[in-house]
Amino acid sequence: MTPNAATGLESLGLKEFLETNANEPLDQIQHHGVTGETLLTIDRRNCRDTYGTAYYQLHRADLMAALIDQFGIGNCSLGKDLKNCTQDGDTVNLEFADGSSAQADVLIAADGLRSVVRDILFDTPAPVFSGHMAWRGLVPAEKLGPEYTQRENNNSLMPGSNCVTYPVRGEELVNVVALTQADDWVEEGWAVKAQKAELLSHFEGWNDHVRGALEAIPDDAVYRWGLFLREPLERWAVGRIALLGDAAHPMLPYMGQGASCAIEDGTVLGRCFAKADTPEQALEIYQKARIERASFLQRESNAGGDRLLAMNPYDLRDKPIKNEDTLDIFAYDPVTVQL
């Protein structure tokens, strides 16, 4: 959770939650994948002074629970599979797979990278497999040594692969994310079970930190997903319907900005409704305020994968790099950006 998103969450009253429940890394450390040699250290201690808030690491489920605690569940209906939506004057009509229907004044479609609403509103081409595969697992920290729960974000890199570890939920869990290359892949989703032996085969001979983390993932808790490319959209809104988050700007994870960009969206959208006289006007202001920023993040994130996985690890030490800092991504403030 980078400062550009933390600013938005703090404006919603979640500053105490973040400071109490999220981990705040002091450094992001880049290592040689095989030798473990430290090649680059990025200081994150200065985020509060530079951006007014911190760089956080936290469990997504904990953030969702905090949002529910802050705002309540309202009249939320879970398990609904949207099949169609239409507009009629000042009403949005929704039809669900179970035969039920609903009406609303406005529809904000935060229905993910395989958004049904996006495909209804716009003629979007099919996603293209990037050639990259992501793997993930959560490890109980008690299964690992104390070096895994330090206030650090550790990334080990070799051409074609990298592996990141960092603690979440205090010192209770360690998140492990690995990225590899693949010739083809069909499924696009976060919940595809994988074999740990296959994951380990991609990291034979790697440093002890990486091998220890991967081997400690419970056998039944290894997941993988293919990473697919989509081009930025020219519009997000039509009438009283608009897209938000991955539905609007699905991006690869190489800048760590997917969730942060969605939080930016939500923060700005709330301001647009406060500013506008009609829902249509609010959504028009919203898309004008957000598309350029989100499209920039989407393009840079998508390009970042090719840069990272093609990189000689010593380039991190010996050559200028392009990352979140050089692109000044964290300086964006969704609370004050001009609408």
Feature roles, as predicted:
Residues 129-131, 147-152, 196-197, 201, ...:
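A short coil-to-beta-strand element that immediately follows conserved catalytic motifs
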Residues 321-339:
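C-terminal auxiliary extensions adjacent to catalytic cores
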Residues 2-140, 183-187, 192-200, 337-339:
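Conserved N-terminal helical subregion
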Residues 31, 150-186, 192, 196-205, ...:
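Active-site substrate-recognition segment that forms the wall
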Residues 108-109, 113, 135, 165, ...:
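Conserved mid-domain beta->alpha element of the FAD-binding
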Residues 16, 141-149, 171, 185, ...:
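Short helix-loop capping/hinge motifs at secondary-structure junctions, enriched
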Residues 21-22, 75, 205-221, 279-284, ...:
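Acidic/histidine metal-binding catalytic segments
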